[in-house]
Amino acid sequence: NTYDSFGHAMEIYKLVNINNDSIPELYINFGTTAGGDVICTYYDGKVVEQPMWNYGFSYMEGQNIFRDAGGHMDVYHDKIYSIENGQFVLLHEGNYGAADNSHVQFDSDGNPIYDYYWDGTEVSSETEYMNLLNEVYNAQQAITPFDGAEYDSETWRYVGNGLCDYEEIIEAINTY
């Protein structure tokens, strides 16, 4: 497996149910922004991966829809996916941020002025962007792998809610 060669000290794993089939998806958090996250699905004898932003993954359990939200330095995104025949299908993509992040402009309330795009088309405001996002993805009903988990300062990782270290996820997969 590709990930067996990595160091496992910072990684967090969890089996999640995105598409409500008989095989759970595997969520991996690599513990750093540079490492990001990945969601893996198993189909037709193969593992298929979708890289994501670090800590930006949420999903509607069993409804075959998930979100990758992320970005930095005034460049952000929301990507909405489903899984079809073992492939990750990008359903919608939103992007927002400063036209020039080296010279961010601010409104009278001190908020950054961003440009917003949904599925490649510019939209007029953050409100319109959020309305378009909410039409296809209910973030209020979505869950994340970290819901209900707590940080354990002795192990230096999040624990609870099914989160696993490397050895634990191997056991969880083997006993599934």
Where are these regions (language model features)?
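N-terminal "mature head" segments of proteins
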Residues: 1-8
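Beta-propeller blade termini
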Residues: 9-18, 56-65
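Structural motif
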Residues: 33-39, 75-80
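Extracellular C-terminal loop/segment signatures of secreted glycoproteins
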Residues: 36-60
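Hydrophobic residues embedded in beta-strands of well-ordered beta-sheets
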Residues: 37, 47, 64-66, 88, ...
